[in-house]
């Protein structure tokens, strides 16, 4: 019954909100004939910069959402109201900065188009607040429907706009831009009455800036922590853009990364569904149960990754109806394996969140992000965009070695993992599995 409950919640919180993405995957055979590596290059650069700003925008204040829900059962809505107001203010200020950054990039695009690209693509940054609040609230309440239905409707609206723009109007990358803007507007609008009226989370303007300063003192380490995750996923394309790698090459990498990253739906759905269990088992010091949940997530992810990686060339032949992108299947397979250790990150970081040791989170993700940047800077001028695939894999997997040399994680990981050599076993299993489906294509 417990396993069935987990699977139901995993489907509700993880798969259902991503259903539009899965439908979009099915639409790729229809739209890829009308897309080029240049279109994916533009889209890859835009998503890298926008992802960077959207990650910074919460200012780490989401740290207080989960903890306050458990610790202040009668007053958590007041704190959440302040946080959502800070989110709105942050979105406005960072949108202005983002527009200026985009105007300085994309030198291959004329300045008039750059301005339109910047204005349209900043909409998700401007309106991120409601969605972030909902993504924290409903997993904690264990009620997926309010989150799922609204997220799904917003995603379907955006996906429909993208499809119509690309398939019927041959709009190329503009179709992606229109789609994400519509998704953000619809989602923001749908969550307003739900959060403000039904849940009683109303924006509270707090003129006592000292409270915000005090909160930021605790939350600021989460900014580089969250930023580190973006450095892992987006820094490569930003560095390629700064090195003036052609948008066509960036587009090939972006296409492979997009396809490989679909595997995170499984990891995300499992972990989000398990959030209440993770909190309860660790807080109750039931560490063997915590470890069992980790094994369940880790081996489910490994099995899914291996299966998808084996079939990736065939998936490309069916889904990507464009010869220009067929070589990207090798990139997609490796990106799948880059994500295989994400359950370890989620379970390890959860401990630091519970203990409110936010500064320690910097090790978990900022260091791998720094490794990715370092390798990209060194290798891109020598090997081109292909080197980015290898640097992404190496940097993602460095998460697994952190408990061996960082005292904080060495101590706390041993509490729930037991012997740390179990991490080595999992790492070796991943290495063995990656060799089979990808070795011939890695050599080529």
Question: What is the predicted role of each segment?
Answer:
Residues 1-6, 145, 169, 173-179, ...:
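Interhelical loop/hinge segments that connect adjacent transmembrane helices in multipass membrane
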Residues 28-52, 173, 211-218, 240-261, ...:
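Interfacial/gating helices of multi-pass transporter permease domains
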Residues 25, 84-110, 267, 291-342, ...:
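Alpha-helical transmembrane segments of multi-pass membrane transport and lipid-handling proteins
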Residues 9-24, 154, 179-195, 209-279, ...:
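Transmembrane helical elements of multi-pass membrane transporters/channels
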Residues 5-63, 91, 95, 99, ...:
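Signature of the first transmembrane helix
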Residues 148-197, 366-374, 385-406:
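Hydrophobic alpha-helical transmembrane segments
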Residues 28, 57-74, 256, 260-284, ...:
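Helix-loop junctions and terminal segments of transmembrane helices
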Residues 432-444:
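Single conserved hydrophobic/aromatic residue that forms the stacking wall/gate
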């Amino acid at each position: 019954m417990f396993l069935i409950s987990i699977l139901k919640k995993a489907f509700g919180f993880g798969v259902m909100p991503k259903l539009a993405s899965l439908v979009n995957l099915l639409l790729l055979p229809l739209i890829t004939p009308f897309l080029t590596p240049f279109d994916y290059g533009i889209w890859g650069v835009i998503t890298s910069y926008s992802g960077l700003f959207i990650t910074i925008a919460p200012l780490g204040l989401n740290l207080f959402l989960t903890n306050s829900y458990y610790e202040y059962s009668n007053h958590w809505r007041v704190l959440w109201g302040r946080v959502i107001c800070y989110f709105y203010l942050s979105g406005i200020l960072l949108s202005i900065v983002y527009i200026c950054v985009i105007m300085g990039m994309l030198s291959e695009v004329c300045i008039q188009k750059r301005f339109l690209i910047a204005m349209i693509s900043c909409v998700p940054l401007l309106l991120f607040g409601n969605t972030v609040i909902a993504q924290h609230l409903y997993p904690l309440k264990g009620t997926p429907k309010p989150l799922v239905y609204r997220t799904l409707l917003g995603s379907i609206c955006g996906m429909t706009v993208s499809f119509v723009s690309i398939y019927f109007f041959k709009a190329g990358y503009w179709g992606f831009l229109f789609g994400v803007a519509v998704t953000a507007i619809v989602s923001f609008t749908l969550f307003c009455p739900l959060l403000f009226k039904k849940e009683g989370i109303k924006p509270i303007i707090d003129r006592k800036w000292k409270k915000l300063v005090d909160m930021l003192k605790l939350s600021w380490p989460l900014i580089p922590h969250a930023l580190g995750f973006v450095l892992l996923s987006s820094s490569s394309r930003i560095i390629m853009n700064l090195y003036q790698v052609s948008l066509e090459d960036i587009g090939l990498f972006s296409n492979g990364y997009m396809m490989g990253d679909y595997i995170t739906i499984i990891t995300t759905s499992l972990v989000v569904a398990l959030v209440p269990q993770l909190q309860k088992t660790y807080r109750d010091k039931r560490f063997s149960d915590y470890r069992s949940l980790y094994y369940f997530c880790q081996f489910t992810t490994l099995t899914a990754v291996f299966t998808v990686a084996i079939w990736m060339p065939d998936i490309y032949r069916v889904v990507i109806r464009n010869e220009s992108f067929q070589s990207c299947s090798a990139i997609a397979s490796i990106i799948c394996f880059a994500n295989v250790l994400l359950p370890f990150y989620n379970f390890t970081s959860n401990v630091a969140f519970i203990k409110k040791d936010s500064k320690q989170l910097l090790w978990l993700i900022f260091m791998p992000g720094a490794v990715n940047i370092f390798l990209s800077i060194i290798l891109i001028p020598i090997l081109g965009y292909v080197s980015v695939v290898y640097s992404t894999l190496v940097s993602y997997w460095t998460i697994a070695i952190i408990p061996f040399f960082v005292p904080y994680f060495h101590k706390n990981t041993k509490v729930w993992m037991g012997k740390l050599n179990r991490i080595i076993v999992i790492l070796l299993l991943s290495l063995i599995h990656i060799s089979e489906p990808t070795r011939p294509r890695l050599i080529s």
